[in-house]
Amino acid sequence: MSLFNTVRNTIVPVHKEGYPFVAAFFVASLILGWIFKPLFWIGMIFTLWCAYFFRDPERVTPQDDDLVISPADGKVSAIQMVTPPAELDLGSEPMLRISVFMNVFNCHVNRAPMRGRIVSINYRSGSFVNAELDKASEDNERNGLVIETKHGQIGVVQIAGLVARRILCWANTNEPMDAGERFGLIRFGSRLDVFLPAGAAPRVSLGQTAIAGETVIAEFASAKGPVISRRS
């Protein structure tokens, strides 16, 4: 393996949504360094942090339609039966909700938890309380996707947080989606909620660290046999 390939495989790519921010921090570092040289190195620290925040590593996603994969990097902050948000139009019956909280040090690229077709995408404005609080699911700005899967419709909700003020979603209604496929990003700390129908059982614990596109957070009763994975 060449040195170039070694370096390329070692460096984690930056998502394109982060390019303007990284460039802005770098230019600011040059300007500050021209004014006072030590400020250049301080600026470069922030530039590197920004690149780290917008990192977009490859993930190896289990390919099994009975498994539910974490849509985000972070900490499992809630596992409970709740009524899904009205805008998702998933009915009034309680569904299993698994929440993953992302702090500013987590990778913030969001991935599909299951394979299926996007039925609807619903944005709702709101406040910006701490995303780790339970009331954030109802009060905060959010963007919800409904995905038709083998086991029925599931909901995936991107929730803005205390610092996060920008939800990005590049998925479209009626598009097919693979498990682990990238569909969005939330800037600077936030939360993802997954709403699952009857038959789903959690496979994570409160406080457990989840990895987007890799960690199995739930499964349906028919899950069996060896699991095949693919890079995403």
From Swiss-Prot:
Chain positions found as Pyruvic acid (Ser): S190
UniProt-listed Pfam families: PS_Dcarbxylase
CC cofactor note: Binds 1 pyruvoyl group covalently per subunit.
Keyword annotations: Cell membrane, Decarboxylase, Lipid biosynthesis, Lipid metabolism, Lyase, Membrane, Phospholipid biosynthesis, Phospholipid metabolism, Pyruvate, Zymogen
GO cellular component, one term: plasma membrane
UniProt topology in membrane: Peripheral membrane protein
Catalysed reaction equations from the record: a 1,2-diacyl-sn-glycero-3-phospho-L-serine + H(+) = a 1,2-diacyl-sn-glycero-3-phosphoethanolamine + CO2
Modification comment: Is synthesized initially as an inactive proenzyme. Formation of the active enzyme involves a self-maturation process in which the active site pyruvoyl group is generated from an internal serine residue via an autocatalytic post-translational modification. Two non-identical subunits are generated from the proenzyme in this reaction, and the pyruvate is formed at the N-terminus of the alpha chain, which is derived from the carboxyl end of the proenzyme.
GO BP terms, alphabetized: phosphatidylethanolamine biosynthetic process
Family: Belongs to the phosphatidylserine decarboxylase family. PSD-A subfamily.
Protein name according to UniProt: Phosphatidylserine decarboxylase proenzyme
